[in-house]
Amino acid sequence: MAVTTTEFDTIAAISTPPGEGGISIIRLSGEEVFQVAAKLFKGADLTQVGSHTIHYGHILDPETGDEVDEVMVTVMRAPKTYTKEDIIEINCHGGIVATNRILQLCLSYGARLAEPGEYTKRAFLNGRIDLTQAESVMDLIRAKTDKSMKVALDQLDGDLSKLIRNLRQDILDALAQVEVNIDYPEYDDVETMTTKMLLEKAHEVKQQIKTLLATAKQGKVLREGLATAIVGRPNVGKSSLLNHLLHEDKAIVTDVAGTTRDVIEEYVNVKGVPLKLIDTAGIRDTTDKVEKIGVERSRKAINTADLVMLVLNASEPLTAEDEALLTATKDTQRILILNKTDLPLQLDLAAVRQVAGDSPIIETSILQSTGMDQLEETIAHLFFDEGIESSQNTVMVTNARHIGLLHQASAALDDVQNGIAAGMPVDLVQIDMTRAWDLLGEITGDSYQDELLDQLFSQFCLGK
């Protein structure tokens, strides 16, 4: 149920990142935005102007009459706004002093500092968007590739919401038939028809949930990035690989073994797949205390990574350290990179292929940029069988909360099928069907708890 705007006070926050810039935006939302602005803005009478218009003027300190900044003020009237409330946005010169001064004046003359995510929370509570769309706002802000941005936009447009609501409607139609059976128990054929319909509907909805969950692995990668550990013994080209993928020098590249003492993390877009690259310290036996800590962190990175890129030096024979790493990573999703192929080959390729298993083997010379296109294509196809474009028009589930609720809803439908198979009365089976309906409703926010909203929106930034 939507909450009316009269239940909300007027809030204000800075919507642009802190620091110096071209402009800053202070956003106000609520019933009294015009009263607050009228006390500060010298220019047009904002109470008389039309919606979605921009007006030039100045912000003055009402107490001293001093001019604070030259501004442009945008007026947006309810309900056609982000929050479905009256909104005023003050565009001032970028910078910490002027921006904070204007915000403080807004707070001094009737507004309250917004909580993190409160604008989006109001958009949800006022019925402009559902919970899935609200969560997609943060996904859009955090998107690291064009594809992850597209998925977030699709969810913001309601693609996932529409699919979930269709599933809920299918369940609701089935529940209505159950009510007929309960109201007319004297007709035996009604119960038979109802249980048959419930079985078919439970199977049908479960299959659609299964199809949606099949996108979860790819969706999670797009939303959170692929945790990718670059591992290998010292001085095989790990940092060079990191720098090449980043197209900049983030890691130190030298001929000295053990130069990378810590774990370096960076995000990079590889063929539309967001990678969270983890350049680890070279793994070897060492007496250096600092390097030892880095080596231990490298081992942990291997265990938690979604993808391991194991770099071997093709210009040297396989060492005991190489063999140990091949063993340590054999149960991971990995790519073997045979680097320095521009030098005379010393590595026993047959021996490497024998222990590689299903792991792709890519021959590279990072120094000469050979083999890198093949590496990037391999990464993309490991997680998107036909490439990132193959999922272009697919509704995807990317959020761990949604994935968990879909699994729970599927389990509830299992209980429906098992209950009917066991000969349970229809009114008892109805309980599990209703549970599946409620669980799907938690995805879109058609049913929710206040604690959930507080947790979700606290992850947003101020001003959004």
UniProtKB/Swiss-Prot annotation:
(6S)-5-formyl-5,6,7,8-tetrahydrofolate binds at residues 27, 89, 128, 464. SUPFAM superfamilies: P-loop containing nucleoside triphosphate hydrolases, TrmE connector domain. It holds the Pfam family MMR_HSR1. One of its GO terms (biological process) is tRNA wobble uridine modification. Gene3D superfamilies: P-loop containing nucleotide triphosphate hydrolases, Probable tRNA modification gtpase trme, domain 1, tRNA modification GTPase MnmE domain 2. GO terms for cellular component: cytosol. Residues 225-384 form the TrmE-type G domain. Its EC number is 3.6.-.-. GTP binds at residues 235-240, 254-260, 279-282. Exhibits a very high intrinsic GTPase hydrolysis rate. Involved in the addition of a carboxymethylaminomethyl (cmnm) group at the wobble position (U34) of certain tRNAs, forming tRNA-cmnm(5)s(2)U34. This is tRNA modification GTPase MnmE. It comes from Levilactobacillus brevis (strain ATCC 367 / BCRC 12310 / CIP 105137 / JCM 1170 / LMG 11437 / NCIMB 947 / NCTC 947) (Lactobacillus brevis). The gene is mnmE.
